[in-house]
UniProtKB/Swiss-Prot annotation:
This is 2-oxoglutarate synthase subunit KorC. NCBIfam families: PorC_KorC, PRK08537.1. Heterotetramer of the KorA, KorB, KorC and KorD subunits. It is an enzyme of class 1 (oxidoreductase). It holds the Pfam family POR. One of its GO terms (molecular function) is 2-oxoglutarate synthase activity. It catalyses: 2 oxidized [2Fe-2S]-[ferredoxin] + 2-oxoglutarate + CoA = succinyl-CoA + 2 reduced [2Fe-2S]-[ferredoxin] + CO2 + H(+).
């Protein structure tokens, strides 16, 4: 049997919930989809506004090397994150960006040259308009990621969200997740 290993990098800045998004993705894969998953994170010393990155490796076999080297999927929630990490993305990989937070004109050549599957998910705006709070933009991105790539099942993602977010916020986070899925279903490419 061929081993399937997928590497995902979610990046943005502190305060966007990047780390929680990585935790949700890892839990969805390992606890609810029955796969192996490793999640790592890094962030700058700033409480808010500094660089933030979550990485998840998902496999159907035990994971012997937990670091993401060349992600199959990059989720960029800020322009700086996009510029910092886009060159690592595998040829033909999936790139999901918040178009309100990045300068898309700067990456058009990259997308063509690398044959990237490109998805636009205006997570911050969608969180504000559909849920009423921007803090759930990370779950909008998890919804977009789930719908665009199928990396985890919808059910697993929903269970992981309920298991990971602060008590009392489950409904808003699930609304944000669904809104993110709908962005992809509606062709926000």
């Amino acid at each position: 049997m061929i081993e399937v290993r997928k590497e995902i990098r979610i990046a943005g800045f502190g305060g966007q919930g990047v780390i929680l998004a990585g935790i949700v993705l890892g839990k969805a894969a390992s606890l609810y989809d029955g796969l192996y998953a490793v999640q790592t994170q890094s962030y700058g010393p700033e409480a808010r506004g500094g660089a933030s990155r979550a990485e998840v490796v998902i496999s159907d076999h035990e994971i012997d090397y937990p670091k993401v080297q060349s992600p199959d999927i990059l989720v960029a929630m800020s322009h700086q994150a996009l510029l910092t990490y886009m060159d690592d993305l595998k040829r033909g990989g999936a790139l999901i960006v918040d178009p309100d937070m990045v300068v898309e004109a700067e990456i058009e050549d990259f997308i063509r040259a690398r044959e990237v599957k490109y998805f636009r998910a205006p997570a911050t705006r969608t969180a504000e308009e559909r849920v009423g709070i921007t803090i759930v933009a990370n779950m909008v991105m998890i919804g977009a990621l789930t719908e665009a790539t199928g990396i985890v099942s919808v059910r697993a993602a929903e269970e992981a969200i309920k298991d990971s977010v602060p008590p009392g916020t489950e409904e808003k986070n699930l609304m944000a997740f669904q809104a993110g899925r709908e962005l992809i279903m509606e062709g926000s490419r």
